[in-house]
């Protein structure tokens, strides 16, 4: 006689929260050709370098001269609804996660990337850099990416604390494994990295664990 023993299967589900926290648009979205001034020159004071808009249409802007982060909510362009002060000097880029934590470049004079933790409203240093990050990004595993315009590469700070180069060689060039003044970056849910390779007039796609774009 044969006895069939039922097998038991256990499934582990890991829920990953998308970090980009940015608006989603339809494929046929169009914009009004007549623009309005959201922030005027008297407030900016110096040329702006980056801006972040989250999924709730809140707008974050790092002020280069004051080192403050200004936030606008509900399209209130007359006055910022929140100002966050920190020891920032000439910040180049900003990234805001879905829970409201803010990552800001502080590499020009202080050699680091700083994080403002929304839960307790405190600043911490999360990454050491050798030059400013012209682009910042946090992937779905909370790894931090920094595009180094002057060093011609993209560094990745893993959640375990290790930092590695994931794109570029550190030398300016146009070959498939090289970058020339990288700027904006984006990491999709497959952990593929897109780089605005500004000096080469191209967008480079680096697949996960691939150094050739």
Task: For every predicted segment, state its role.
Residues 67-70, 110-114, 152-155, 163, ...:
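Structural signal for beta-propeller blades
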Residues 20-47, 76-92, 103, 120-132, ...:
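Gly/Pro-rich loop segments of beta-rich domains
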Residues 58-60, 101-104, 143-146, 192-195:
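Conserved beta-propeller blade signature
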Residues 61-83:
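Beta-propeller domains
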Residues 5-19:
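Cleavable N-terminal signal peptides of Sec/SRP-targeted secreted and luminal proteins
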Residues 56, 64-65, 107-108, 149, ...:
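Short loop/turn segments immediately following the C-termini of beta-strands
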Residues 53-56, 96-99, 138-141, 187-190:
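Residue-level detector of Asp-centered blade-edge/turn motifs that repeat once per structural unit
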Residues 18-20, 39-67:
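Beta-strand-rich domains and repeat architectures in extracellular enzymes and scaffolds
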